[in-house]
Every structure is written in C-alpha cells, then in structure tokens.
Amino acid sequence: MLVDSFNRVIDYIRVSVTKQCNFRCQYCMPATPLNFFDNEELLPLDNVLEFLKIAIDEGVKKIRITGGEPLLRKGLDEFIAKLHAYNKEVALVLSTNGFLLKKMAKDLKKAGLSRVNVSLDSLKSDRVLKISQKDALKNTLEGIEESLKVGLKLKLNTVVMKSVNGDEILDLLEYAKNRRIQIRYIEFMENTHAKSFVKGLKEEEILDLIAQKYKIMETEKPKQGSSKIYTLENGYQFGIIAPHSDDFCQSCNRIRLASDGKICPCLYYQDAIDAKEAIINKDTKMMKRLLKQSVINKPEKNMWNDKNSETPTRAFYYTGG
C-alpha cells in the first residue's frame, strides 16, 4: 500500500502518454506549435507498462490515461489490453477531446477500458473552433455516440468560461441528461500557458444558472475524487470541480506520471521525481523506490489559494490535468 506523509492512501495514477495534442485550447496550450514535441522523447509504452505493474502491485486501483491527447499515441489499445490482462480489477479510464474517438471506441472497449471522459466545452461549432482552434464538434459528438453504442461508460468535462460558453451550461446539461451521461463543470484553473483573457465562472455561479430551471436536491462529496456531485429532483446527477472554493487536498489519492518519465506528486507543485532512466532500463528496484519517494513527497495542500503563491507554470498538457 502507498501511503503519504499525511496518512492519505495513494491508489490512483494519472499517466500522460504524450504531450502532443491536435487541439490548441485557449485555456491550455493556445500558442503552441503543432509540431512542438519530438516523439522520440516518449517513453516506450512497454516500459511504462512495467512501471504501472509495480504501482498495481503496491496497491494502485485506478489508472487514468491522459495527454496531451492520448488517442494520438500509436499502440494505445494494445497497451490498455496488456494493463487489463495484468489485473482486471484495476479501473482503466481515459481522458480525451473525442476527435479520434469514433474510430477507436470499439477497440478501446475490447481492450478493457472501463470509461472515457470526453471534453465538451460547447455544442456550437463556431465556439468549439474558437476555443480549440479546431473544427471539431462533429467528430467529438460522433465519438460520444459511438462510445455509447459500443458500451463504453462515459463522462463529459466542460471548462466553464465567462463570455465564452457560460450561457451553454443548461444546454450542455440537457445534452448529457438526455444520454444518461454525467457532466462535470470545471472551474477554469489559471496557468501561464492560457490566454490572458480567459476567465472562469465559479461554482456558485454555475449552480445559480442551473437553479433557474431545476431544483437542486442534494450535494454529495465523494470520500475520494475532485468533484462535488449534485442531484436534481428528477434524479439526474452532475458534478462540479471547484479548485477555487474546494481544493480537495485532504482526500487526494493520486500522483501523475508525465510522458517524459517524471513523477509529479501534485498538479500545482513544480517539484517532480525523474524516473525516466529507471523506466527505460526497467530497473524494478529503482522504479519501486522512486514511486514510493514520490508518494512521500506529496505536499499537504496545493497552495492554490495562497496569495503569495505564483500562477502554476507547469503545463496541463504535460501532466494531463
């Protein structure tokens, strides 16, 4: 079992398999060239697999595959299948912008993927183009429908931004509710890579907009996880991830492995442990030692609301959010 210095059990790893992305979202990497990253720097997936086997043996129960855009990584379905074969009890989930999902959903399901989280920031083509710099809405919606068709579990993630998509909160809720998919609204998280004009809506503002149409019956905060779950009177549940008002550090159960082999104990701390050499060499003892050290290095809090702290400079496309 992996336990940090504050007695939190760490049983969840987010694994970035690439920094590459086919979107250039305003809140993530808007000014980054499309060919900014040399693929040769990527860790071989078979080596990452060996690291994750160690993590599973140490008690990890959930692995999320992220990017960048993870569906750009060749051989991903085979990688997932090998992970699933190693331990079928481990939940394997994937975060994606959905652009390539339609053609890959069936293979991902067959490989053993438990769930896919799809980013959907608007239901309007022109807005999706403005937000992501990609004419992507049709592909993303088709990817969602195909995932449902093949039996993949789904969640939707929406970053809510003032004067951009805040007026679509109810429309997106209806879209998700009609398909029996949970949607999670995410407060914009400031970072030095985002466009300066991007401003987010806070949790209470999101709730006020939903309350104009629906009565919100109850609130549930899972013991682990970043989102608060709200239930409408018709039984539908949606989530809000609100790092500004609820840092969820007390129940944090995760670490992150970046695509270059660095283990990040916390999304908002620059400190990381470089495990690249150990992973490349498949050095079992060293990988285990560095994994345990990264857990010990987890800070108590992320300092998000500390007035003296600086805006995070580590890119979300590097750690996968």
Curated annotation (Swiss-Prot):
Oligomer status and interactors: Monomer and homodimer.
HAMAP family in the record: MoaA_B
Keyword set includes Electron transport: no
SUPFAM superfamilies: Radical SAM enzymes (SSF102114)
Listed transmembrane segments: none
Any Gene Ontology biological process: Mo-molybdopterin cofactor biosynthetic process
EC number, as in UniProt: 4.1.99.22
Family statement: Belongs to the radical SAM superfamily. MoaA family.
Binding positions for GTP per the UniProt entry: 14, 64, 95, 155, 254-256
Protein name: GTP 3',8-cyclase
Keywords in alphabetical order: 4Fe-4S, GTP-binding, Iron, Iron-sulfur, Lyase, Metal-binding, Molybdenum cofactor biosynthesis, Nucleotide-binding, S-adenosyl-L-methionine
Residue sites binding S-adenosyl-L-methionine per the record: 27, 68, 119, 189
